[in-house]
């Protein structure tokens, strides 16, 4: 990864962060589905980075999200968990022959089906953790499941839409 790629990653991180805190922070579709588009940056962190580097980046990025959401570490906890299990999810989804390069994870490098499944798994786990922690003390199974499923679907759709609109470096896949 060269300096230009790192600068592009930083610009995308900042853009996604702005979209999250300015648009989606107070927006809930039908009062149920929230959108955690910031996960798009986290699940696209390069595989070339060591896990510890990704954990540090995720920690500071989601800590900023928690500050704006006024949620004391809930998003950070969930995001650190998914970045920690991400290598296992990738091993689970990698075909027998492997991939040419796992340096960049996007719809254009991995294919839409693979990326959608990958994002669904990680976003579902993240939203499950977030809403489980938030609902401690006032647990309602039906409401919680509705929030988890609808937020997962909305977030994955938004992440894919963001990639198609703003990530224009397409591969041959």
Give residue spans per PLM region.
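Terminal, non-globular segments
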Residues: 1-173
């Amino acid at each position: 990864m060269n300096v230009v790629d790192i600068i592009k990653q930083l610009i995308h991180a900042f853009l996604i962060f702005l979209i999250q805190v300015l648009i989606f922070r107070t927006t809930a579709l039908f009062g149920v589905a929230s959108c955690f588009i910031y996960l798009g940056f986290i699940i696209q962190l390069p595989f070339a980075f060591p896990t510890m580097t990704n954990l540090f980046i995720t920690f500071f990025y989601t800590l900023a999200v928690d500050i704006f959401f006024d949620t004391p570490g809930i998003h950070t906890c969930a995001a650190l968990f998914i970045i920690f299990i991400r290598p296992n999810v990738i091993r689970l989804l990698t075909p027998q022959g492997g991939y040419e390069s796992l340096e960049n994870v996007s719809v254009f490098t991995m294919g839409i089906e693979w990326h959608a499944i990958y994002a669904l798994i990680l976003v579902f786990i993240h939203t499950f953790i977030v809403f489980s922690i938030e609902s401690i003390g006032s647990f309602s199974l039906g409401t919680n499941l509705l929030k988890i499923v609808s937020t997962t679907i909305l977030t994955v759709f938004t992440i894919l839409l963001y990639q198609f609109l703003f990530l224009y470096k397409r591969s041959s896949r």
